[in-house]
Amino acid sequence: MNKDLKGLYAALLVPFDENGQVNEQGLKQIAQNTIETEELDGLYVNGSSGENFLLNTEQKKQVFKVAKEAVGDKVKLIAQVGSLDLNEAIELGKYATEIGYDALSAVTPFYYPFTFEEIRDYYFDIIEATQNNMIIYAIPDLTGVNISIEQFSELFNHEKIVGVKYTAPNFFLLERIRKAFPDKLILSGFDEMLVQATISGVDGAIGSTYNVNGRRARKIFDLARQGQIQEAYQLQHDSNDIIETVLSMGIYPTLKEILRHRGIDAGLPKRPFKPFNEAHRQTLDQLIAKYDL
């Protein structure tokens, strides 16, 4: 790796206006919040939490640009460029590399039943075109793509595939990957399983709720690495109470409402997502007060 990419990252939220356009000022505020308030190590930009798959190519570039302008070189930046359109993925990868992103990431191609060889070559083609480091984004519950340990081995043989964002509940496979590839980067993608992932030896984590709950995630991560498992679990219980409540109200509009409570112009989710339901206002206010969000 050209740069140490270990640590905790916010899966950056993106604010939109009523017309579905990116709210640049609000995006800068959200990005800065992750550094100044949540004290995270980096940003994972244009992932699921950024509602990436609802954006056109120019909007994705806009998000990359504004996030980079907001944080400069203060934290590490990973650009998620995955797309069903390989040409778009390459275009985005080149752009993010040119403006200074530390690494690329790409979700596995989804919807169509691609063969592993097609998936492998998709990654190799992006790397060849961009000459940047690549982090595989494995999220089988949403893509339907399960990568075996043998297939991970074939991918990791490429020197520029430096790691994986592992968003899966299969901790046996996670342990196997960690044992087989001790020098590869593993970033956990399930906020609700941070203790278990840390015990399994991940190098960090990427989370949507870290936009508002990053400090608690940091404590969980540090305590688990230090062997203080019961203390880490107690904080994980608190985090999971937060996550459960947020999910019940709609994750993206609710996280944006928590940011709005902090005075951040967090905008709206992009349609067809609905805005925050005011019927949940009392529940949200109680959540913010109870967990100091």
Swiss-Prot record:
Its EC number is 4.1.3.3. Keywords: Carbohydrate metabolism, Cytoplasm, Lyase, Schiff base. Signal peptide: none annotated. One of its GO terms (cellular component) is cytosol. It holds the Pfam family DHDPS. Aceneuramate binds at S48, S49, T167, G189, D191, E192, S208. Its main location: cytoplasm. The active site is at Y137 (proton donor), K165 (schiff-base intermediate with substrate). One of its GO terms (biological process) is carbohydrate metabolic process. One of its GO terms (molecular function) is N-acetylneuraminate lyase activity. The keyword Hydrolase does not apply. It is an enzyme of class 4 (lyase). Belongs to the DapA family. NanA subfamily. Catalyzes the reversible aldol cleavage of N-acetylneuraminic acid (sialic acid; Neu5Ac) to form pyruvate and N-acetylmannosamine (ManNAc) via a Schiff base intermediate. This is N-acetylneuraminate lyase. It comes from Staphylococcus aureus (strain bovine RF122 / ET3-1).
